[in-house]
Regions:
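Flexible, D/E/H-enriched segments
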Residues: 1-45, 57-156, 167, 189-274
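Extracytoplasmic, non-cytosolic globular domains
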Residues: 165, 182-186
Length: 274
């Protein structure tokens, strides 16, 4: 049977690969290396990545609430992110099993069988893997094109995904990466004058960081209303990627939780069960 051996939450700024070499001394690559050490120790055979698309894989004429990639291989980045190009394998048996389980459990994934991925998935994989050699299962969540899915629905999706992994007959060690910011505004009215981006609701981001450290996931689900996420910035809905992850975790506290990043309104966390 397959087993969930690790779960991590990280940011995915498209500027990181050009700003910070993997082995750089700055806080960002150093923290990614801390997270990567946990993933390496978990010895995963497959990685499920939960992220949002930025109108690169999908567009407004067909922008799904939840989507899954079911194929043999994919590539990225499919946007203008300055980083290495990767061709990577998709763990198709796990992806197919998750799709079938979702349908049986009342979750109607959109399915794509030919696709690239943008920086939201590839920046974390760039820092957290060795050249994306581990097969991936891509999961997309709509986090900024209203109406967004509710936090309750995203948490339930995570519970379903956990069950799908554990019911796969194949022996497989699975890790999960969720990626996104808690409070961030890019190029919008909440950006401070003269800046490209801002953190509109720093207290909300710090509050979420504390909640995660205490495994207060039900409280996060209750508090993550559309109004609150919008107050946190036009990128604030990326919290929903994390909420899916929290649904997969259960009630465990993180084994590793980096200091809250006040400059960019995000966090790094690791859970392990290996």
């Amino acid at each position: 049977m397959a087993e969930l051996v690790a779960a991590v939450g990280v940011p995915h700024s498209p500027h990181y690969p050009s700003q910070y070499p993997k082995d750089g001394p700055q806080d960002t690559p150093r923290t990614y290396r801390e997270v990567k050490a946990h993933l390496d120790a978990a010895k995963a055979d497959a990685i499920v990545v939960i992220a949002n698309d930025h109108f690169n894989t999908f567009f407004m004429n067909n922008f799904p609430t939840f989507a899954i990639g079911v194929t043999e291989a994919a590539y990225g980045p499919n946007d203008q992110t300055k980083m290495p190009h990767y061709d990577f394998a998709v763990q198709s048996s796990l992806a197919s099993h998750m799709l079938k389980t979702a349908m049986n459990e009342g979750f109607d994934f959109s399915v794509t069988q030919e696709f690239g991925v943008d920086h939201a998935m590839l920046v974390p994989l760039h820092y957290l893997t060795d050249d994306v050699k581990t097969p991936v299962v891509p999961i997309w969540v709509n986090t900024f094109s209203a109406p967004l899915p509710t936090a309750r629905r995203c948490y339930a999706l995570g519970r379903m995904m956990q069950g799908a992994i554990r019911s796969l007959p194949q022996k497989l060690r699975v890790a999960v990466i969720a990626t996104g910011s808690f409070s961030l505004e890019i190029g919008g009215p909440k950006v401070d004058p003269g800046k490209r981006n801002s953190v509109p609701d720093l207290e909300w981001s710090k509050h979420l960081h504390r909640r995660i450290g205490k495994a207060e996931f039900d409280e996060i689900v209750a508090e993550a209303t559309p109004e609150q996420m919008w107050k946190a910035g036009n990128i604030g809905g990326e919290l929903l990627n994390w909420v899916v992850l929290l649904g997969m975790i259960g009630k465990d506290k993180p084994r590793y939780l980096a200091d809250h990043d006040e400059k960019d309104g995000h966090a790094y966390a690791v859970w392990r069960w290996d």
